[in-house]
Every structure is written in structure tokens, then in C-alpha cells.
Amino acid sequence: MLDHRLAPEYEDLRRTVAEFAHDVVAPKIGEYYEHDEFPYEIIAEMGRMGLFGLPFPEEYGGMGGDYLALCLVLEELARVDSSVAITLEAAVSLGAMPIHRYGTEEQKRTWLPRLCSGEMLGAFGLTEPEGGSDAGATRTTARYDEATDEWVINGSKCFITNAGTEITGLVTVAALTLSREEGAEGSPTREISTIIVPSGTPGFTASKKYSKVGWNASDTRELSFTDCRVPAANLLGEAGRGYAQFLRILDEGRIAIAALATGLAQGCVDESLSYAAQRRAFGRPIGANQAIQFKIADMEMRAHTSRLAWYHAASRLQAGERFKKEAAIAKLHSSEAAVTNAREATQIHGGYGFMNEYPVARMWRDSKILEIGEGTSEVQRMLIARELGMTYS
């Protein structure tokens, strides 16, 4: 029998972050959204709280926590705002986790302390204009230059979170590497590897921020690499293992996104309950109408089942058990729950739900990307079917 009751230390963490989200994030985030500004002040406070180092060992500047703790934090943050939550999720799951999981001891000691403190943000350069769901279709190349013992990177990436802030310190880039060995027919062997590219490296450029429908307070950019040279020692893990690396990273990240989506879904419940109690029509609160009650009951059900799904996936991850299917289920269910809850919350608010000053308008805009980022809903269904042993052509 599954027991998803949280230990006291997790409940304490949840309460602390919930208070932070309510007292610090909520009063300020609307202004950041209005001006498409990155919330440096909020991010700095999150760094002081140790949130960026939650799942990492203390020897590297982390808090010695685990992935469950990170996901609890993401849920509580997203209950108020998703931009702040995705900044943390991408910085930890995509920026720091690959280095912790696959880096050399020198790479860990060079980068992790600053990433864990929040002094520096990391990003993961995977998606390309012609390679989103088909991540194996990477066209960015990294050629090894024996004369200088460097990788020379050329190509572009798109939709990369945390890629161009004032505190972005690195991007881990997935690239097609040409190995030093000759192929069977005399041509270089082609393989995907991941390489750490520090910000400010000549030939590495982050474009202007995208103008997005949602997540307006997060940083998302296109990256370009033109004869960008980095030391050979910046290779993350073994050459040719990049594809396997980012598949594992994405599997873990889906649990984090599921927690974030659950938070947004629950936030829609919170806002709808409050509005339904205050808004009066026909002489009584609209919450007295069964139609509104049923909507909110269904919204709570979706948020609750989403939470159970990501709890289960996270528990399997931490137990060292296979979790690919459970992560896909959690990501799929919670993201679709978030989209539905945001739509219903907007409907409950009526015309006010279409006004930017109401949080549900922001939640509505923020929700759709959850069905796309870190694996579309279609890809999640494909993964679930594959884990069930089904084949496809």
C-alpha cells in the first residue's frame, strides 16, 4: 500500500516556502509580468534560502536534501507563480543536475557551489529549431581540435530557459561530436555529447528574450554558437553518452514539471474558492450555486490526483526503481489538469478572469506551455505505451 504522508521535515519545508510565496512572491510578481522583467530580487532571496541547492550534497554547497524536497518547493511556488517556479526547476534539474550526475570531481567543485547558492544559474541547451521532440536530431556540432585540445561548437538552440540572465554562468550544450576514431568507411563516427559552455565564451551568443504568452517573468532565449571554443575538459561525462544523459535528465525533470503543474492547478482552486465566496450574483455568493461547486470540486480532484501521481513517481526515483512510466503519467496528467483548471478558474471569474490584474489570467496564460515543455503530451503518451510493451512503426 502506498503511503504518501510527508515526514515532519518535508511539511516544515512546504510551510516555509508557502509563506515565502504568499508574502514575497505574490505581492511583486504582477509587476514583473507587466514589464517582462526577470525577478532578480526574488531569485536572490530563494538563493539565500538554499532552494537552489536542495537536492545536492553539502560538500558541494548543497542542502543535502532530495528530489522530493525540490518538487514540494516547486509545487508551492507554482501555486502562486509559475515563472519563479520554472526558473528554479530549470536551474536545478537542467542546469546543475547534469553536472552533479555526470561531471568530474573538478567540474563539480568548479560549478556546483555557485549553482547551489543561486549566485549563478545554469541552463541546458537541447532543443533546436528542427529538433524538439526528436531530440536525437541534434544538428549543433562540436569538432575536436587536436592542436589546441578544444571543442569547436557551431549551431543554434531555441527555447532555452535561464540562458541569458545577468547571473547565467553556463549552458550545457548537446552537440553532435565527431570522434577521434575513423568510422568503418573512413568517415568520422557521429555521436551526441554534452559540453559545458561558460557564459561570455567568444562565439557564444544569447539572443534577446522571447516575447512569450506566459511565463513572462522567466528568461527564455535562442542561443547561437559560431566557432565557439571551449577546453576539451569541459566535456560532461563520456563522449557519445550525451543522448543517454539527457534522456535520464528529462525523465527526472518530468517529475519536477508535474509538481509545478500541480501547484498551478491547486492555485486555480485557491483563487476560485476565494472569488466564489466574495462575488455575489442574484443576491448570494456565486459559490452557493451547485454549478460553481461542481466546477471547483472537479478542479480539486484534478489537483489532488496530480499530486498523488508525482509523489508516486518521485518515491520510485528515490528508491532507485524504474520510474520512466510513472514520470510520464505524472507529467501528462498534471499538465492537462493545470490547463483544465486554469480554463475553469477563468470561467468562474467571468469577465474579471480576462483581466491581467487577476492571478487566474496569468495562470491561464502560464498553463499551456506545461503540455509542451520537457516533453509534449503526445510524447508522454508514446512513452507510456512503450513502457507497456507496445510497439509502433
Residue ranges of predicted features:
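Long, acidic (Asp/Glu-rich), low-complexity accessory segments flanking structured domains
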Residues: 223, 227-244
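Flexible, small-/acidic-enriched active-site or ligand-binding loops
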Residues: 200-229
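Short Ser/Thr-interspersed hydrophobic loop/turn segments at strand-loop and sheet-helix junctions
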Residues: 50, 74-78, 175-177, 197-202, ...
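Alpha-helical interface subdomain recognition
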Residues: 1-90, 102-107, 114-119, 134, ...
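A short, Trp-centered hydrophobic/proline-enriched beta-strand micro-motif
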Residues: 118-126, 173
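A short core secondary-structure module
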Residues: 150, 154-205
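Flexible, glycine-rich active-site loops centered on histidine and acidic residues
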Residues: 96-102, 124, 136, 180
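Short Gly/Pro-enriched turn/cap motifs at secondary-structure boundaries
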Residues: 88, 115, 130-133, 161-166, ...
